[in-house]
Amino acid sequence: MKTVTARPLTAEAFAPYGSVADISELENLVSLADAYEGTGEAKTPVLQLVQAKAMSGSPVISQMEIHPFSSQTFLPLDQSSSLIVVCEAGEDGMPDESTIKAFLASPSQIVTYRHGVMHHRLTPLAPSGRFAMTMWQTGRGGDTVLYPLHTPVSVDISDITP
C-alpha cells in the first residue's frame, strides 16, 4: 500500500485543484466566486447540509470522485479539521494514483474543488463533521462520478497539528 503524507492546506498549494478561503482572517466580505464555476449543462444550483463521518483508524483512500459539470464547495459548520485528498486524472480518465496529494483543512477553511478535479469525499478528523455543500447539477445524473483506486492509499496525518 502506498502512503502519502498530509500537509497543511494553503491556498497556494491547493491552487491547481481549486481555492481555499479562511474565515478566521475574515475582516470583510469573502467572495467565493469559484464556488459557482460550472459548465452550461449544469443549470440547477444545489445547497446541501452534509453530516460526514470520520474514518476509523488511519485514513485509507480506496476511491476518488469527480464532478464533470460543476465546482463543489464545502463550508464547515463545526470546529472539525478535515482531510482533503486530490489527484490528477490520467489519460484514460481514471485517477492518476502517482499524483495523489493530501492536505489537512482547518475548521475555518472553506474548500472549493474546481470542476473536473478528482478528489476523495470530504473526511472530518473528528468523529463527525457538519458541512454546507454547494454545487450545480444537470438534473439528468452523472454529476458525481466515482472511480475506484487500483491500490488503496494510506494517508499519514501524524506530522500535522490541526
Swiss-Prot record:
InterPro entries: RmlC_Cupin_sf, UAH_cupin, Ureidogly_lyase, Ureidoglycolate_lyase_dom_sf. CDD domains: cupin_UAH (cd20298). The keyword Disulfide bond does not apply. Signal peptide: none annotated. It comes from the Bacteria. Its cofactor is Ni(2+). Its EC number is 4.3.2.3. One of its GO terms (biological process) is purine nucleobase metabolic process. Coiled coil: none annotated. Keywords: Lyase, Purine metabolism. Pfam families: Ureidogly_lyase. It catalyses: (S)-ureidoglycolate = urea + glyoxylate. One of its GO terms (molecular function) is ureidoglycolate lyase activity. Belongs to the ureidoglycolate lyase family. Homodimer. NCBIfam families: PRK13395.1 (NF009932). This is Putative ureidoglycolate lyase. It comes from Agrobacterium fabrum (strain C58 / ATCC 33970).
